[in-house]
Amino acid sequence: MIYIIDHQDSFTWNLVHQFSKFDEVYCSNYFEINQKKLDQSNTIVLSPGPGSPRDYPQTSKIYNKYKGKKKLIGICLGYQLILFNEKGKIIQQKNIYHGYQSIVRVTKESKLFKKDKNFKVGRYHSLKLLEPFKSNNIKISMRCAKTGIPMGIEDLKNNVYGFQFHPESFLTENGKTIIKKILSA
């Protein structure tokens, strides 16, 4: 079962629809966690949402409790939450990307996606990871081809993955394939 933690974002139900193509999905609001269902899940998805990662201490506790024990996937805010909990600094970026399509390039650090492959993604964010970012396990797996901003992460040791972009967006090429690849990792 996939447990999606909803950070009160309209894209969450698009994620529910996409992930339900691969497994049973349970979704609840971040402040109404069903602990029994969370424990039963094999994958936890941290959804997009408004604000900053520091606005969601409940989700940070869940991330830290289940990291290395269950597959964790972060989308947009969820991606930022993962990096924030790994001592990454999340900052306001110069340009805001809400409803923009950009090209991302897969980095040589990616073990799941074909190195140097480019594809279009849908972006809806005003925050980004400040670099340099140091981690023993988390690798930057994708970057914006134009700006170099990190757009994807992989931590194979702890089974943690994330995307700054929205794989469920109509602006993202092959979003279903991206989700399938992460779920089968």
What are these language model-derived features?
Residues 110-157:
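Catalytic beta-strand/loop cores that center a nucleophilic Ser/Cys/Thr
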Residues 32-41, 133-134:
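Short amphipathic alpha-helix with an adjacent loop that forms part of the alpha/beta core around
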Residues 167-185:
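Acyltransferase
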Residues 20-36:
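A short, well-structured beta->alpha microelement
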Residues 76, 125, 166:
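Histidine-centered divalent metal-coordination motifs
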Residues 11, 127-130, 169-171:
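Active-site environment of divalent metal-dependent phosphoester hydrolases
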Residues 43-110, 120, 179:
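Cysteine-nucleophile active-site neighborhood
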Residues 2-21:
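Short, charged N-terminal beta->alpha structural module
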